[in-house]
């Protein structure tokens, strides 16, 4: 469990996550990182019935043209992504955060839905969640940006309160755009041997501790 922290105090946030599990972002699908790859890490923990995520991302050029929530943020510029699946079922969530303060929320009923989407058998619009199911804040720092995101127990169908012993699969990823029109640099905390963020067999199984 994380120590108490003030969500508006980035120094206190960093201190609370000091002893939390930290997951580095990488490019496991590539023998060597791309020249434009920039590092980052993600810390995770829980407190007050909320699963908390802190990301610290190096970035040479923050950019996004996002203007509203639930746009295809990964096509519009820099984005940080959370993939979360409580172990009680097959449902999982794909949550995006853009440096502009916009979000994308998708609820997948099962692991095969991504294949049905890519084959045109289902529509992304049917997966959108309009009401906020997580909170987040971002800040720009010299050489990058930071994200604090909180997913309440209710999003996972868990009772509020003590989350110790709860288990979920988790993966965190990003699209890092350079602003020069080139393709974004992708990275993930998961050891994806194939570049597919939805490969749940590569995600990290987390057990939340007291």
Stretch-by-stretch model annotation:
Residues 1-210:
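Structural preference for beta-rich elements and adjacent junctions enriched in aromatics
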